[in-house]
UniProtKB/Swiss-Prot annotation:
GO terms for biological process: ribosomal large subunit assembly. One of its GO terms (cellular component) is nucleolus. Residues 218-239 have a biased composition (Acidic residues). Pfam families: Ribosomal_L10 (PF00466), RL10P_insert (PF17777). Associates with the pre-60S ribosomal particle. Interacts with MINAS-60 (product of an alternative open reading frame of RBM10). This is mRNA turnover protein 4 homolog. Belongs to the universal ribosomal protein uL10 family. The keyword Acetylation does not apply.
Length: 239
């Protein structure tokens, strides 16, 4: 009787070795960037969206961006003056908490600040986000939805029914009030009706100068991101 493919054993040693190699490659790549670029910026992300971050990577192909794997980045840069790769990089490591990333570039502080201050993209809010406005729906036909979606809309809490094959809202319905912390159902309804309430934004927080080794906080009047969490993001980095 032939063996099932599901019975195939996976060597944990090989898996661990591959993971170690990936981390080592990332460390080497980060240090190479430290040696190559004039400036290193730490950025945080509000309302993280992978697709939006990819757009920024494409716009900044002349530079390098790394996001996630905070602990590995800290090892690459150094956690203290005694093991830092270059002067003052341990100060960078201290700030690698939560959803933050690194931007290596030859663009000046002014160029970086100007570009990222202007760059914002709206997207649909997710559960846990705050509603930025009050949304109410008027009764009547909802011709944008096929009849097959009526049960789904009703399941989300909307007072709907099929009238002559057309999805119809039977009465006024308040989806959310400004300032509400959105539930999964509210977030889904807002997306179905096209309301974008989440602002994706990259906030430049700190800068390190490769030539002088100077580490500085960016202007205090820059908008703040959401509070940093103790955990680290596991998004894929650019390696």
């Amino acid at each position: 009787m032939p063996k099932s493919k599901r019975d195939k054993k996976v060597s944990l040693t090989k898996t661990a070795k591959k993971g170690l190699e990936l981390k080592q490659n990332l460390i080497e790549e980060l240090r190479k960037c430290v040696d190559t670029y004039k400036y290193l910026f730490i950025f945080s992300v509000a309302n993280m969206r992978n697709s939006k971050l990819k757009d920024i990577r494409n716009a900044w192909k002349h530079s390098r961006m790394f996001f996630g794997k905070n602990k590995v980045m800290m090892v690459a840069l150094g956690r203290s003056p005694s093991d830092e790769y270059k002067d003052n990089l341990h100060q960078v490591s201290k700030k690698l908490r939560g959803e933050v990333g690194l931007l290596f570039t030859n663009r000046t502080k002014e160029e970086v600040n100007e570009w990222f201050t202007k760059y914002t993209e709206m997207d649909f809010a997710r559960a846990g986000n705050k509603a930025t406005l009050t949304v109410s729906l008027d009764p009547g036909p909802l011709k944008q939805f096929p009849h097959s979606m009526e049960p789904q809309l009703r399941q989300l809490g909307l007072p709907t029914a099929l009238k002559k094959g057309v999805v119809t809202l039977l009465s006024d319905y308040e989806v959310c009030k400004e300032g509400d912390v959105l539930t999964p159902e509210q977030a889904r309804i807002l997306k179905l009706f096209g309301y974008e309430m989440a602002e994706f934004k990259v906030i430049i927080k700190y800068m390190w100068d490769a030539q002088s080794g100077r580490f500085q906080q960016m202007d205090d009047d820059l908008p703040e991101s959401a509070p940093e969490s103790e955990g680290e993001s596991e998004e894929e980095d650019d390696s």
